[in-house]
Structure formats: C-alpha cells, structure tokens
Amino acid sequence: MLIFELSKTGRQAKAQIPRAVGKNYSIPEEFQRKSPPRLPACSELQVVRHFTCLSQKNFSIDTNFYPLGSCTMKYNPRGVHKAASLPGFINRHPLAMDNESQGFLETLYKLQNYISEITGMPGVSLTPMAGSQGEFAGVAMIKAYHQSRGDTARDEILIPDAAHGTNPASAVMCGFKVVEIATAPDGDIDLDELKRKVGPRTAGIMLTNPSTLGLFMRQIKEIASLVHQAGGLLYYDGANLNAILGKVRPGDMGFDVMHLNLHKTFATPHGGGGPGAGPVAVGKRLIPYMPLPVVKKTDSGYHWATRQDYPQSIGRLSCFMGNAGILLRAYFYMLVLGKEGLLRVSEFATLNANYLLKELTKVGYTAAYPDRRASHEFILTLNSEKKNYDVTAMDFAKRLLDYGVHAPTTYFPLLVPECLLIEPPETESKEELDAFVAVMKTIREEASKQPDILKTAPHTLPVKRLDDVKAARELDLNYFATHE
C-alpha cells in the first residue's frame, strides 16, 4: 500500500519540536513556496507505522546477509556518519570563501593524499559524483590526452567480455568504438587475442583486477606492456579494489587512470540512487587533464585549484565540490582503520571468499573456476542443477530470499552459464558464512526433491517475481498521474 492511499482530509501530524541548532536559518520570502506541497494527509502514527513496515520488508546490510557479487555490501560504521555530520562540515555553504573553509579543505586535501597513497597514483580529483561518472571522467581524460598529442586516430577502447556494463557505456559516451577481448578458459584474458587487436587505433584498455570472475589477472604486467608499447593507456575499474587494499596498488601494476567506488571499498552509504562519489586517480601524464576542482596546498593555506592551474582539464562534472558529505565519510573510514586496518580489509575479504567457496563445494556446488584461488568474490555455476533438477540460478536466488538472505548477483558475468556471483565482505563473521552454507545446502536438497518450491519462490515476501520487461516499458512512478 502507498502512503497516499492512507490519506484522509483533515488528518495531520503535530509539528515536531525544533532541535537546538544555534542560528536560525530562514528561507527568504521570494524563495518560499506559494502553495503547499501535495503531501498525504496522515497522522504521525500512520506515517511511522507505514515506513517502519516498509523497512521491515526490505533487505539491507543492517538486517540481512547480503552477498551481492561485485557490489561489496559491507557494513557502514555509524561513527563515520556521525563524524561527517559535525556542524563545521554540514553548516558550511558551498560558496564559502577559501579562508572560511580551511578545515574542510584540509580534510579533502588529506583525502586526496590518502587515495594517492592507496592507488599508487600522484594525481587525484574528488569531484565525480558516482563510480560511473568517475569512470566516464577517466575515459574522457584518456581521450583528452591523445587529442592533445594530435593522436586523433586512436578511436578504440579494448574491453574484456567479463567487464562491468558501465565500461563499454563510458567508452561509447566518450566517442570510442568498443573492441571486445575474450576470456581464456582459465579465467585470464586471452593474450593471443589481445595481441591481435591492440594497435595504432588503441586509445586504451579498461580492466578490473581482480576481474568480475573473482580472479586476479596474473598477466597484468604483460598486458600493460603490450598496451603501452602500442601507445595506449590502461584504465582501472576500481569496483574490486577491496580485494587488494594494502597488497598491491593499481599504479604499480601499470595503470594510468582509475576511479574508486567509495560506496564499495570505503563504506559510504550504498544503494538508494545516491548520493555517491567516484574519485579518480591518475598517473603523472594525465594530471593536467583532471576534472576540477581539486584542492591545492600553498604557503598561505588550502585553496581550490582553478582552470588557470589546469588549462587542459576536462572541466567540471558537478556543481561545487561534488558530494562532499560522502567524501567526508570515506575520509573518516580511512582515518579510523588506518593503514593496517585497510590491509586487514583485503585480507579478511579474501579469506571470507575462499572459505565460503570451499565450504559450498563441499555441499555439492560447482565452482566456475575450480583450479583458481578466489579473490574477494567467486562464481558458482548451477549448470548441473539446471540439467538434473530443471531449476535455474534465478530460482535459487529467489528461494534464498525466503531464508532471509539477499540473493547473490545472478547471470553476471554473462560468459558463465547459470551463475551466482557471491561476495562475502570482510565485515561478515564465520558464523554468518556457515549459516549461509547451511541454507544453500538445504536449498540444493529442495531442488532435488521438491523443485517446484524453488520455481515458485519467494513464498514469504509481498513482492514475488516481477515482469521486468513490463516494468521497464510501462513506468508508473507518479501516484497522481495514475490516480486522477
């Protein structure tokens, strides 16, 4: 039920007692609404019950195990959110002068330095407002670099067939042609195909390491050498950075540019459509093209760098500083954990993944790459379950919901049939992993004896199986558009 359906003329919630906020900030009359918003007329109790019930029907990191592969659904520490909400941060106006924002600017400057140290890249811009926008910025910098050298014939970006879908999207948005590179049977890139396809038209290659197959790319140094010798650059998709924190740096692997997903690796709020942040880090040759603004330190303090400092910049990607509140959360997360803590993040994430993979194979599941060690995530292929029991990976995923577990990523990467991509982040305990194994064992037994239970799942949730095509083609997003 929608809250609008609870509405009845005359009902209202009592005004909340205002918090003590120091100064009283009022909105000038010329900016105030001329008519009241079309809000539902409900009592405070109705509103509280409605949204509390909705929250109890949702899966979340706070309430459920959430092994969504390639998403790193880790716990967001509450203390980090509290620190980012200090009055000095949240009451600062985006147009405040530099001399009125020294604490804020110093924090962002330190965050730039932390990211530089983590990635092994000297240049950092914090402004992109999502991982996808950071990815676009990275490819745009590759294009600007080649154009500045008069190397305009480079119109191709090489992308593995196991890549995230945003990779080809970013390349196309920047005007490049996408050239797909196949994956070899062992899960690594097919080097022979790469050698055939790299050449004078290659602007760069986009890679995730570890890949979306949950495997570390063992020939990365050779790949970097091949692409660089051909005049191209290497782009690092930071989606799986959680697996290598403190162990190896993208810059040391030969990458020239990357973006970071703060909502994955650095525990900022995840999902809900934002706000987000996707900082970019670059090697020395791409520093002139970084998006603005960036924070600079001089003898007189901290300042925003301008177009005069970076005349070849690809420009702005957002108003002001991007989503500063998200950047602050990532900064405090790094500050709380420290260097040793971030190292343990990757160690525990990798340990959890390999332990879970081993335990699931013990109860009958098949690893997509049984001869390879997992990084932070791994893939099960349910081909035999489909053949023997006529149940699909989607059926398994839907049945997991009945057991209070959010489903893993299904049918991605596309090259692995009937796959589940499973990622148990470092914040999950052994007890939680063992409980998940027990559930997976039970579901597999159900598939062999009562497959219809899986085919008709979920049975305990208000929303069953949606018509994805209908939902995408017939949008129903506005209550008043369909009820007036």
Swiss-Prot record:
Record's Gene3D superfamilies? 6.20.440.10, Aspartate Aminotransferase, domain 1, Type I PLP-dependent aspartate aminotransferase-like (Major domain)
Q: What are the entry keywords? A: Oxidoreductase, Pyridoxal phosphate
Q: Which residues carry this modification: N6-(pyridoxal phosphate)lysine?
A: 264
Q: Can you list the GO cellular component terms from the UniProt entry? A: cytosol; glycine cleavage complex
Q: What InterPro entries does the entry give?
A: Aminotrans_V_dom (IPR000192), GcvPB (IPR023012), GDC-P_C (IPR049316), GDC_P (IPR020581), PyrdxlP-dep_Trfase (IPR015424), PyrdxlP-dep_Trfase_major (IPR015421), PyrdxlP-dep_Trfase_small (IPR015422)
Q: What GO biological process terms does the UniProt entry carry, in alphabetical order?
A: glycine decarboxylation via glycine cleavage system
Q: Give the main EC class.
A: oxidoreductase
Q: How does it assemble?
A: The glycine cleavage system is composed of four proteins: P, T, L and H. In this organism, the P 'protein' is a heterodimer of two subunits.
Identification of the protein by name: Probable glycine dehydrogenase (decarboxylating) subunit 2
